[in-house]
């Protein structure tokens, strides 16, 4: 035997000798037990036995041999055993909880950035192309994107209503500045009449319906995805602090602290013994496993479907193009709309007015024309893919939790002497049961009774969110429009195939990075050269300036409401 292996072998022989001595003669002093009791802050050592004695009043740590425990110590040990169990659960779930919570925060932050960027693009459209109506349109643009954010983050707002509200407010501006320009009626009553007439005269054609369809395909899945992540955090928080039954508490005490009473504080339980105790204590939690598995699978399916026309970045960052198309369509049908408005609202009392124009800040030209996330290395779709790849590792988390705790934390290694609940033995000889409530009928260590109502509530929530996730996942071969209230429009069906250009690839590392590349198809400089542009001259006539581009940028609108909206899990 060489110099390196001798100490290891010697220690093993010494341990076996000590174990044999403890089994045959019992512990001679309680000094080490007293020290550990004090070190764990379980109570004062005053009154604790100095040497082993009979323990007739013990309820769980019963032994024929003299003991270092009193009834008071046993009660303190039982509290410590429950606390240890909760600590083990929290430690085991901490990585999973961190994965979900950090990614939920990153997704929310990225969506907020998308919304602000889309709002900025729409503001730039008005300031560069429809300057005379830009300041009047600012409030409607801000309100629209605030509503988008509120809806995404769980507020009770109706997408159909805020889309209609935006186009209702846009029509009076288009009418006064493009259809009947130059001199306008300044009365609120006449503008309100024009606003109310929008849905009757349809100045923007089917574009409002197209916007509703796009919002339905992109906003609702993203909203549901965020809410589902929030529920995942709630499930983990709940299971981290489960109440353990009396039978479980007694079994934990017997497994972890009864060896202390015999002076065997460093002895670990046998693997089979540990599995029986932990599988019994966590039997109800194991019932979550199939529902947790379905939850992760449904998240994956929804994530895979959220690309192409279902990609929220594509929809939001192209919203300004649909607004421009809507204004152009109304301008092209100006004469017809003029007659319809005159018929509905009458002819206005015409008074000369001067519309306020945008105030430009040349120093901020580049600031507004570039996306703030252009230097990022990944798309939002890739982030979802990486997150799901990491989350897949936890599909059987609740089904294998008892085994994980015994293997990683609690049980003795194979081949070492271990505690079987009564004494130090070479191996555990009782039957080892499986996971789940049904398997516990033959558990020799823990009696499992009834059904845990808290676990049942979690199961019901998981079932419900799985239904929501599956309901928001378009079919891969034939996607259907998600209904929004009573509205919505006809949309084309598109393929659900996912390729690299869709941004569906991912490394699967799950590492959280604070900056996200929102799109890989937006130019570095937002360019309006392809946008049909109509500028109003000082004389009231209109001038086509297609290709002129946007010379300056405006500050993005403030978005304070979204920052304070929390995810709302209470929809279930």
UniProtKB/Swiss-Prot annotation:
This is Glypican-5. In adult, primarily expressed in the brain. Also detected in fetal brain, lung and liver. The lineage of its organism: Eukaryota, Metazoa, Chordata, Craniata, Vertebrata. Cell surface proteoglycan that bears heparan sulfate. Residues 355-375 are annotated as: Disordered. InterPro entries: Glypican, Glypican_CS. It holds the Pfam family Glypican. Glycans are attached at residues 120, 237, 441, 486, 495, 507, 509, 527. It comes from Homo sapiens (Human).
């Amino acid at each position: 035997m060489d110099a390196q292996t001798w100490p290891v072998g010697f220690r093993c022989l010494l341990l076996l000798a000590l174990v044999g001595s403890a089994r045959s003669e019992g512990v001679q002093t309680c000094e080490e037990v007293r020290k550990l009791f004090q070190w764990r802050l379980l109570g004062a050592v005053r009154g604790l036995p100095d040497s082993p004695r009979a323990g007739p009043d013990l309820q769980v740590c019963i032994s024929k041999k003299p003991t270092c425990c009193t009834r008071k110590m046993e009660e303190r040990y039982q509290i410590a055993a429950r606390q240890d169990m909760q600590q083990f659960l929290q430690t085991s779930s901490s990585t999973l909880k961190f994965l979900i919570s950090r990614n939920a925060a990153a997704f929310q932050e990225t969506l907020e950035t998308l919304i602000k960027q889309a709002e900025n693009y729409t503001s730039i459209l008005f300031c560069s192309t429809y300057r005379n109506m830009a300041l009047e349109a600012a409030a409607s643009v801000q309100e629209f994107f605030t509503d988008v954010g509120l809806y995404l983050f769980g507020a009770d707002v109706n997408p159909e209503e805020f889309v209609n509200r935006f186009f209702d407010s846009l029509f009076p501006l288009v009418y006064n500045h493009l259809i009947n320009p130059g001199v306008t009626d300044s009365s609120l009553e006449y503008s309100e009449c024009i606003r109310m007439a929008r849905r009757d005269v349809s100045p923007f054609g089917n574009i409002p319906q197209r916007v509703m369809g796009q919002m339905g395909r992109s906003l609702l899945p993203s909203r549901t995805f965020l809410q589902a992540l929030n529920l995942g955090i709630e499930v983990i928080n709940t299971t981290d602090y489960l109440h353990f039954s009396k039978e479980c508490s007694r079994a934990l005490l017997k497994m972890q602290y009864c060896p202390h009473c015999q002076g065997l504080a460093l002895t670990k339980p046998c693997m089979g013994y540990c599995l029986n105790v932990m599988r019994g204590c966590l039997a109800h939690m194991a019932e979550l496993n199939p529902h947790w598995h379905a939850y992760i699978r449904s998240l994956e399916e929804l994530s895979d479907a959220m690309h192409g026309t279902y990609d929220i970045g594509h929809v939001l960052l192209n919203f300004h193009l649909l607004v421009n198309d809507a204004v152009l369509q109304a301008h092209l049908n100006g004469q017809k709309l003029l007659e319809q408005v005159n018929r509905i609202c009458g002819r206005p009392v015409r008074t000369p007015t001067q519309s306020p124009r945008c105030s430009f800040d040349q120093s901020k030209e580049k600031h507004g024309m570039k996306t703030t996330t252009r230097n990022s290395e990944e798309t939002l779709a890739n982030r979802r893919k990486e997150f799901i790849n990491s989350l897949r590792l936890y599909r059987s988390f609740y089904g294998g939790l008892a085994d994980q705790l015994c293997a990683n934390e609690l049980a003795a290694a194979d081949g070492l002497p271990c505690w079987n609940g009564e004494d130090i033995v070479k191996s555990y000889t009782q039957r080892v049961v499986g996971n789940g409530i049904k398997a516990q009928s033959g558990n020799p260590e823990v009696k499992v009774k009834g059904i845990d109502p808290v676990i049942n509530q979690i199961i019901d929530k998981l079932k419900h969110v799985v239904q929501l996730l599956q309901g928001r996942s378009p079919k891969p071969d034939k996607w259907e429009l998600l209904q929004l209230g009573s509205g919505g429009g006809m949309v084309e069906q598109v393929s659900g195939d996912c390729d690299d250009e869709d941004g569906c690839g991912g490394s699967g590392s799950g590492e959280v990075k604070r900056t996200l590349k929102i799109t890989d198809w937006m130019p570095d400089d937002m360019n309006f050269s392809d946008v049909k542009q109509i500028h109003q001259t000082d004389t009231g006539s209109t001038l086509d300036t297609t290709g002129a581009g946007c010379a300056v940028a405006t500050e993005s609108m403030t978005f304070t409401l979204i920052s304070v909206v929390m995810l709302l899990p209470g929809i279930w």
